Swiss-Prot record:
The gene is perM. Its main location: membrane. This is Putative permease PerM. It is a multi-pass membrane protein. It comes from Escherichia coli (strain K12). It is found in: Cell membrane.
Length: 353
């Protein structure tokens, strides 16, 4: 048994390039695992740098210097963010306040509807269980106000951190874009010399991460706008807020779409009732989700589609548990990285001979 393990070890780990790749991966995972909180602004800056690299290169191709191309792209990007912050965010925030205000009425309607179930289906529903659920719901509503106050006070503590990030992140993005080659050369100098295999994996993953980040942003925008227009067509309350939530839900494959469907169905059901308008609105929402999953995602993420849905869900759960939001956001690239490493890893036949 021990001899078999030794043979397996020699086959898989006799190549110096494989050892170098393993060291780089373990070091990278360890740094992110232990210092993810401290590295949050850097991770945001790296994501934005990947996103803005394409327009920067395009401006360079028409004669702009790297410095000027970076400056122009960053100014335009910040301008778009400010426009969204002053136009979209206040409306979505106001709709969120209205939703919280109307939630007790919605829950009361749900409680009244649930109270009729034991009379309609006495064999399936117990009145005592329904009453207990209604009482539990009322008690939660009474404590909701205190929870909102506590969250508000806690959020005040994070305002300083957010203010610092708003200054640091654009500066980091600027220097990551402007001095990209110098920084990559500096990283190469500290890596092991036998890094041919690592370079092969990096070249493949670098392009995939670029496509993934650009694709995710485009998917969020397309799905969010399409959902908003669909909800506006039916005059659904809180349409912009719900559309923003649906847009952000694409960051979490499968799970996000399932979770965000709950408030969409709840709001539509309480506004329209279980009538034709509700089912028409819900059908439009399902069509948008189907087009996203079966048309938009295959076009934007052709490589990721090769991953089995169970692998994607497990990746979201595992990496999300390890690194929170960033683990969820990069679940598909990380799963693709593991797949690329497995495929690129030496099979050991040369070493055996």
């Amino acid at each position: 048994m021990l001899e078999m393990l030794m043979q397996w070890y020699r086959r898989r780990f006799s190549d110096p390039e494989a050892i170098a790749l393993l060291v780089i991966l373990v070091a990278g995972f360890g740094i992110i695992f232990f210092f993810s909180g401290l590295l949050a602004p850097l991770l945001v800056a790296i994501v934005l740098a990947y996103l803005l690299e394409w327009p920067t290169v395009r401006l360079q191709s028409i004669g702009c210097s790297r410095r000027w191309a970076t400056s122009i792209v960053l100014v335009v990007f910040v301008g778009i963010l400010l426009l969204m912050a002053f136009v979209v965010l206040p409306i979505a925030w106001q709709q969120g306040i209205y939703l919280i205000r109307d939630m007790p009425g919605m829950l009361n309607k749900l409680s009244d509807f649930a109270a009729t179930l034991p009379r309609r289906y006495p064999a399936l529903m117990d009145a005592g269980i329904i009453d207990a659920m209604a009482e539990n719901m009322r008690s939660r509503m009474l404590t909701m106000g205190d929870s909102v106050v506590k969250i508000s006070l806690a959020s005040l503590v994070g305002l300083l951190t957010i203010a610092v990030y708003l200054v640091l992140v654009p500066l980091m993005v600027f220097f990551l874009l402007k001095d990209k080659e110098q920084m990559l050369n500096a990283v190469r100098r500290v890596l092991p010399r036998n890094r041919g295999l690592a370079g092969q994996v990096w070249k493949e993953m670098n392009q995939q991460i670029t496509n993934y980040i650009r694709g995710k942003v485009l998917e969020m925008i397309v799905v969010g706008i399409a959902t908003w227009l669909g909800f506006l067509l039916f005059g659904l309350n809180y349409s912009l807020l719900l559309a923003v939530l649906v847009g952000f839900s694409v960051l979490i494959p499968y799970i996000g779409a399932f979770v965000v469907t709950i408030p969409v169905v709840g709001v539509a059901l309480f506004q329209f009732g279980a009538g034709t308008e509700f089912w028409s609105c819900f059908a439009v929402y399902l069509i948008i989700q189907a087009l996203d999953g079966n048309l938009l995602v295959p076009v934007l993420f052709s490589e990721a589609v090769n991953l089995h849905p169970l692998v994607i869900i497990l990746s979201v759960v595992i990496f999300g548990g390890l690194w929170g939001f960033w683990g969820v956001f990069f679940a598909i690239p990380l799963a693709t990285l593991i797949k690329a490493v497995i495929h690129a890893w030496p099979d050991g036949q040369i070493a055996q001979e």
